[in-house]
């Protein structure tokens, strides 16, 4: 029976794709890949390429990166309808996403539209912040410590509350939001407790502990994450 698979391809290194994900990628009839900018190559596709069969049908679809949900919903509905049609025609269809499909992924919106229409299965992947923690040798949590994962697009109030309440705080995709995040870290005395990792697990990975040299005007790679550790291991 044909099925729709949401497949996490991990943080960037193709060798961090799970065995199950690699096997399913090899067996797909159609692969959908997300495209943030029209005409740009999907980064997730680059990670998955070593596992794709030669004549696989690839459908790269644009997902607008805008705040308006109404604008995004039009595209979600159109793409989910196309996926459903492919599955009903007997094709095994995949949608790949960076990291894990259930962590800040467009896939979640497609799943909500499709799970009552067709057979769906979600294949987990390694998140960027779990990869970061391993590379840094820093446990995300120990004993009774708490962990928060926040998008840098959240309000200053939400980010500050997380920084005050939790022991470890991940702030994702900070590159375009330094003017919000840096003042909060400085206010709470956490600049020296913050690890910065750009392009985790990729060839151009950059790592830094302490943000005194970073300003709101600093140009950082798009895939830059802060890990705030109140107790550095």
State where each predicted segment sits.
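A polyampholytic, Gly/Pro-enriched intrinsically disordered region
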Residues: 78-86, 139-151, 213-224
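Short gly/pro/ser/thr-enriched loop/turn and capping motifs at secondary-structure boundaries
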Residues: 38-41, 66, 127-130, 178-179, ...
């Amino acid at each position: 029976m044909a099925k729709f698979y949401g497949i996490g391809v991990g943080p960037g290194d193709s060798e961090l794709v799970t065995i199950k994900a690699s096997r399913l990628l090899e067996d797909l009839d159609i692969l959908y890949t997300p495209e943030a900018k029209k005409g740009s190559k999907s980064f997730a596709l680059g990670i998955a390429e070593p596992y794709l069969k030669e004549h696989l049908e690839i459908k790269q679809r644009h997902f607008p990166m805008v705040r308006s949900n109404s604008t995004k919903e039009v595209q979600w509905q159109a793409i989910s309808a196309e996926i459903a049609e492919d599955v009903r025609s007997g094709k095994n269809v995949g949608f790949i996403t960076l990291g894990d499909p259930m962590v800040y992924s467009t896939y979640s919106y497609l799943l909500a539209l499709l799970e009552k229409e067709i057979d769906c299965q979600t294949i987990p992947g390694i998140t960027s912040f779990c990869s970061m923690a391993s590379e840094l040798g820093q446990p995300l949590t120990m004993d009774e410590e708490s962990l928060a994962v926040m998008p840098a697009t959240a309000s200053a109030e939400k980010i500050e509350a997380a920084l005050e309440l939790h022991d470890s705080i991940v702030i994702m995709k900070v590159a375009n939001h330094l003017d919000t995040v840096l003042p909060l870290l400085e206010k709470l005395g956490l600049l020296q407790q913050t690890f910065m990792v750009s392009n985790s697990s990729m060839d151009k990975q950059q790592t830094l502990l302490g943000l005194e040299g970073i300003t709101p005007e600093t140009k950082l790679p798009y895939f830059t994450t802060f890990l705030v550790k109140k107790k550095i291991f």
